[in-house]
Amino acid sequence: MVKRRLSAFGNAFLIYFIIFRLCCCSPQTSHWCKYPALCLKSPDTHNENLVCDAYLSVIATKSEEKEASNPTTWDFTPTNKYQEPSFHTKTSLNGSDTISSNFLSKYEYSNGTSTSEFIDSISPPLVNETSTISSSKKLEQNYSVTEVIDTNIITSSSVTLPISEDGSSTSAAATIDSNIDEKTVAFSEEKRFNFASTDCAAAVIKTNPEAVGSSSILTENKDKYMLNKCSAENKFVVIELCEDIYVDTVQIANFEFFSSIFRDFKVSVSGKYPKYESSWMELGTFTALNLRTLQSFHIENPLIWAKYLKIEFLTHYGSEFYCPVSLLRVYGKTMIEEFEEANEDFLEQKVNDGSAIKADEIRKPQESPIFVDEEDTDVQSKPVRKNPSVELNSTDTLLSSTVISKSLSTVVIGNETGKSESYPATSTRSFNDISPSSSSSYSTAQISTFPSNQESIYKNINKRLSTLEERKKAFDEIVEKILTNYGKHNAKNMNFTQLLHELNSTLQLEISKLSKSVVKPSLFALQAKLELLSAENEYFQSQITSLYQESSFQKRLLMLQLTVLIVLTVYMAVSRLPENLPTTRSSSNNPIEASRPPFSRDEQDISKANDFRVSASSAVYTVGPELLQRKKRDPNTSIRSIHEREQDKIIHSRSHSVC
């Protein structure tokens, strides 16, 4: 049993070795390969694509035949649809797409084979799946493969892809880096700073709900990627960049096999994170190639200084389940870089203007004055040469961006015939752009590359400083005129001051004479009257003081008399009281009981209550010894009647004493 298994294993290993020798050969060993088109990978190169060397093997085999006169075509179909050629694509000036293969080849082949036959023979998937190549109408171009020694440098072997005769092309040019592991990258983008990297604190702000691992696209690790379902309706990613930049290049890559590659996508930017989707500013819609390499997309008009970048994936190649994105890079210019470039251009223009002015001074042409209209005052500047090849402004007053204040809003230049034309001060036309036959001149300013783009803060500050300098110059001119006028009137002011001084001295002399003759005698008389009045005032004050003292004495005497009168009145009233007032309980030894009246108020209340509410028999009275004696004298008289009589006597005696 073991022997059978070992023999089967040996047979399988032998079959595998034979197939490997037949199919996995290199271009250098293609002279003994029976099927060079089946070569999968070259051991001498580090290319990740598995079909490039197969194409090279076909080219090398055909190059050995050296059939330049007879066009040769090849029929080749890749063994795997995911094994795609690694091409470096860029847009040339004439509009044709140039593909440069990054591989090592020691063969040179050149014949009259048309480009359509070459593309159809060696790369059917690229032609069929890419919308940028028209299979019906193609221009015939020759191709060549040249020898390159260093494998780390992109070779000069290239193939010019055909374009349609009507000039149609893609909406954006895609630059594909076939070997991102190598040091040399197309357009030297690798040397630039990536503003969508986690090294500078860039972050993924938002993605569609189906996206997984979105932060992986900001790292350089090829094994990590943002995974997205191709069936998702709205696939997007929002990234916060490191700084506010002018976005000029976006690079996207998908290195994953057995997955669909993005095709059409839209790039939008915003300075602040927008609340609404309509706030995003679209930079363009781009079409990528069906290649698993780093693809570059250049943006012509960045519009604004972007802090947030949004990429929406619209379509994709193939019909796989997942549409991953492995890497994203964003390149651009910061505000300070834009300002430095503008400053360099300004310095170059300043040097050119200075040389032009020096050359014009030698010619000594006819001069004509220039007038500047202001809101309130017309200011005439120095004459300027009429030659249109000379700039209007000198090197001392030339600014990086011509921004004149409201007071210097219009420039009017006269000519020999008396005609004049007015132009705003923000005109971007210079003297160098006008032919010598022109009859008018224009002010100079820099021409911006993108006039609709948002200006940087440094450029805005520079413009404000330029405006401030212009206003200061205008202010200095006005102050100089004012000082000139002041100098003219200064002599008149001095004469007027001297006249006032002489008049003042004359008036002082006249006033002193008048005071000596008139004012002093009157002053003496007034002083005598004042002394007399002060003496009379002192006499009146002494009289008033004596009267006050007398009145206070009389007041005290009156109070004393009133007091004595009151005392006498009280005494007389007390002395007139009757002496025989009846008293009750006089025999009592208690003085308090003796001083009590015959009956108290409580007893009166009781008697009144008995009169009105109770019968006479139930009345209670206090009976003294006198009442008992009277009762004995007159038994028919009741105690009540006797008591009433006594009360009448008491009341009568009291009223009499008071009277």
Swiss-Prot record:
GO biological process assignments: protein folding in endoplasmic reticulum
Membrane-spanning intervals of the chain: 557-574
Region of interest: Disordered: 417-445, 580-603, 632-659
Free-text function comment from the UniProt entry: May be involved in membrane protein folding.
The protein's assembly and partners: Interacts with EMP65.
Record carries keyword tRNA-binding: no
SUN domain: residues covered: 173-335
Residues in compartment: Lumenal: 26-556
Biased composition (Basic and acidic residues): 641-651
Cytoplasmic membrane side: 575-659
InterPro entries per record: Suco/Slp1-like, SUN_dom
Family that this chain belongs to: Belongs to the SLP1 family.
Membrane topology listed for this record: Single-pass type I membrane protein
Domain of life: Eukaryota
Protein name stated in the entry: Uncharacterized protein slp1
